[in-house]
């Protein structure tokens, strides 16, 4: 399920690095994580929805790339982000 505008704005406000920041890796990873969590519930009910599963895998891969980039550029920001989001690693 897609995020509502209010929940997306709240996530951006929570994870932004500077005022008006919507494109930092932290914000992008947070938005992808919430979308992924929403889709996981969908797949519990719709096991054979392979078309949407492809989109889920694409989001997971994009999040992984952003996390790898952040880990390479600034390890402290990376560790604080995964702790805040509760991601494994």
UniProtKB/Swiss-Prot annotation:
GO cellular component annotations of the record: cytosolic small ribosomal subunit
Gene Ontology molecular-function annotations: rRNA binding; structural constituent of ribosome
Entry-linked PROSITE patterns: RIBOSOMAL_S15
Alphabetically ordered keywords of this record: Ribonucleoprotein, Ribosomal protein, RNA-binding, rRNA-binding
Biological process according to GO: translation
Function: One of the primary rRNA binding proteins, it binds directly to 16S rRNA where it helps nucleate assembly of the platform of the 30S subunit by binding and bridging several RNA helices of the 16S rRNA. Forms an intersubunit bridge (bridge B4) with the 23S rRNA of the 50S subunit in the ribosome.
HAMAP family per record: Ribosomal_uS15_B (MF_01343_B)
Family: Belongs to the universal ribosomal protein uS15 family.
Assembly and binders: Part of the 30S ribosomal subunit. Forms a bridge to the 50S subunit in the 70S ribosome, contacting the 23S rRNA.
Protein name, UniProt field: Small ribosomal subunit protein uS15
Species for this entry: Marinomonas sp. (strain MWYL1)
């Amino acid at each position: 399920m897609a995020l509502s505008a209010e929940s997306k704005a709240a996530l951006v406000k929570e994870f932004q690095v500077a005022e008006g920041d919507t494109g930092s890796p932290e914000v992008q990873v947070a938005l992808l994580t919430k979308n992924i969590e929403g889709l996981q519930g969908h797949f519990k009910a719709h096991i054979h929805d392979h078309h949407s599963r492809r989109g889920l895998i694409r989001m997971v891969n994009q999040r992984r790339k952003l996390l790898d980039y952040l880990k390479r550029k600034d390890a402290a920001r990376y560790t604080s982000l995964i702790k805040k989001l509760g991601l494994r690693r």
